[in-house]
Amino acid sequence: MRPELSQYKHLSAGKVREIYEIDDKHILMVASDRISAYDFILDTEIPDKGRVLTAMSQFFFDTIDFPNHLAGPADDPRIPEEVLGRAMVCKKLNMLPFECVVRGYLTGSGLVEYKQTSSVCGVELPEGLVESSQLPEPIFTPATKADIGDHDINVSFDVVEERLGEARANQLRDASIAIYKAAAEIARERGVILADTKFEFGIDEDGTLVLGDEVLTPDSSRYWPLEGYEAGSVQPSFDKQFVRNWLTGPKSGWDKDSGLEPPALPGSVVEATRERYIEAYELISGQKFCQWIGSCV
């Protein structure tokens, strides 16, 4: 259910977030407990998910040395009490039309493409890689942004260059890989593998490239436990892959290619997903989720 914030104008709704206008330079970004999978927004929500996403984004925005769109603290007085802990005050940006995906490990759609072409988004990879193989170096594999219900489409770097120009495309690629490497090092020090992630960038009024949207959350990233990692099999995860696996498993009775809406998640899957999201936040940030604003009340 969308929060009714009478003091602000509602601008748009995404799969997970609601955007409100604060003034001509700032927006309020509110993370709901909705969860999406296979381009569907599920009927079942995950309690506290929006707070975890906001807490995780806040942690990395504060930690990673790169311009970002945050324009106030987590307890900014411009955030209404009813969404405190799941909302951020952000600068308005001219968002760039690409999902900036960085992969350090081979899995998901990247693995499917690799098996067909020995490459991912035009990036040639060595022979012999298997599910969950670590790549020699992280690779930039952009995708076009899709409307709700449509698939993001993986594209080659040439497409980004054609759309944005060589200089901006190079800046986008280099920034994405640098941020991924910094975050992956932080995660690894805490016993977690950052397998891949996606970023969104925008341009501010000064022409500066700025990191926007959410960043390095369990929604936008694949996180695996370092302990027990072994290439060649699907890894346990701290992200929504758990939901994807249940939906495509025998217990759901659902075929993702059927065109039908997915079923409701059972309580056990909801609680296990909530626990995984919270565990990811606590492991990587080193902070207790109960200490985050609006949690454990």
Curated annotation (Swiss-Prot):
Keywords: ATP-binding, Ligase, Nucleotide-binding, Purine biosynthesis. One of its GO terms (biological process) is 'de novo' IMP biosynthetic process. Pathway: Purine metabolism; IMP biosynthesis via de novo pathway; 5-amino-1-(5-phospho-D-ribosyl)imidazole-4-carboxamide from 5-amino-1-(5-phospho-D-ribosyl)imidazole-4-carboxylate: step 1/2. It catalyses: 5-amino-1-(5-phospho-D-ribosyl)imidazole-4-carboxylate + L-aspartate + ATP = (2S)-2-[5-amino-1-(5-phospho-beta-D-ribosyl)imidazole-4-carboxamido]succinate + ADP + phosphate + 2 H(+). It comes from the Bacteria. One of its GO terms (cellular component) is cytoplasm. Its EC number is 6.3.2.6. InterPro entries: SAICAR_synt/ADE2_N, SAICAR_synth, SAICAR_synthetase_CS. It holds the Pfam family SAICAR_synt. One of its GO terms (molecular function) is phosphoribosylaminoimidazolesuccinocarboxamide synthase activity. Transmembrane segments: none annotated. NCBIfam families: PRK13961.1, purC. Belongs to the SAICAR synthetase family. This is Phosphoribosylaminoimidazole-succinocarboxamide synthase.
